[in-house]
Amino acid sequence: MTSRANKDFRRAATLRAPVLKGTNVIPGLGVDVPELRRARGLWQVNRFDEALELFEKAVQLYPQNLVALIDASRALGARFEIARAEAMLDRLMKAARQRPDILHLAGQSYRMIFRPDRAIECFRRVLALTMELPDAYLELAILYERRHRVGEAFALIEDCLRAAPDYLEAELFKARLLRRMKDDVAAESLFRALATNTQAHPLVQAQAWAEIAQRHDRDEEYEKAMRAMLNCKKILLEREGVMRQQAEKVMGHLRGLVGSLTPAHFERWAQATETLPCKSLAVLTSFPRSGTTLLEQVLDAHTGLVSSDEREAFARDIFPAMWMTPATPLPTVQALDAIPVQRLAALRQRYWAYMEAALNEPIGTRVHLDKNPPLTVVLPGFLRLFPEARLLIALRDPRDVVISCFMQYLPLNSNSVYFLTLERAAQRYENDMAMWRKLREKIASPWLEVRYEDTVRNLEEQARRALAFLGLPWEPSVLGYRERLSQKAVASPTYEAVSQPLYTRAIGRWKNYQEFLEPGLPILQPSIDAFGY
């Protein structure tokens, strides 16, 4: 039996692993012209602005080339230039007419550029025209499941598997839907079959092992849960390559940057932007699995606030543009100090425009909340750009955080590579939160720490506290945040959990795995003590 290549549920169809590469002529789409190949090469080495110029040049030179329109739209969307991306896709849609293959590619592109409703429309049109594109069933099912339309998603997956019985990624998603539909026996049977299927892509196997681990955890079979999760992590460890070493190099530099800063730097930066229009914004950060998603969803239910959920815009695009030059490949205190006010003004506006584009609505007079746990390590840069920002820091028992980070599957990246062993996860937690503890003694910006344990025990009290900190009046409707989630897609990996009623069973979860966590406890002790756990 032959399996399709794993696509991490369609998230990997990006310019880093383009769908449209290989031969120079792509039937039905056009020529993969040299400009596009060079642009992809630049993109892969993070030379994004140069890549965008080449993508757009290709569209200008070859206006009928559908490959150029698709690649350019995805590149622009990835850089939050969404209006320009939509213009490209409008042209693609005119060319598509009744071609399901083009409509499918357009649907993928709309999904990538934060336009899920347009993506849904495209995939529906595909399925009305043909049953020969199983991917379209899976794409649409995933979009529905994110909106908790589980029954409709399941019907689509059944259709998908009738069209492509050997589509193992669809089998994996079917098993997840069965779990959500409370058919644990059928779900586990599928997960186990996939985990041990040597024809399945290793990442499909890894995800199946993670689901098996979660089932054992729910059944309080903690040793079995850990064994299953170790099988998942073993597969990922074999694929990490040099990712961890590269991440460690950057992290070491960021630690040094935080250590070099003084209160005087932050005071000086606040004074430097006094002439610029003040923005009403806040950052919600800390560390993954610390309760940021729950707090964000509660606050986002307030009429005076709008949140952006884990956008990459600042860390990937804005922050490097602040300081990066051929002579400054990594941020330094001197480089941050030397940023001219004109550049700060332009980048502040660029950040705001990116967020509004992804939200697909103006922020207006509302508070903008940038929820992003990994932002902790680049907070100096954010506060250089926006000294007026308020900081909400989510706290949770460090031991529970580390167990929670380890006990899930995440696609490999510079953050998740730390979650492949418990000891690494503990080291990364201590790294990030030690940086926060240093920063809170130096920064001039207001900050507030909110404990997950307090939030799940008394949501109203902590919601009132956070809203008051943000300068917003109390609105009882925020306590009904779950009603909004029934039709709202959440980007965080915890989108399913946050839609459930509040529960306290995750408090002290680490005790179930104490034997395995033991080597990491001394690493976490400074944070345990500092945060009062």
Give the positions of each predicted feature.
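Phosphate-binding active sites in nucleotide-utilizing proteins
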Residues: 275-386, 394
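PAPS-dependent sulfotransferases, especially Golgi type II membrane carbohydrate sulfotransferases
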Residues: 185-195, 199, 208-273, 333-338, ...
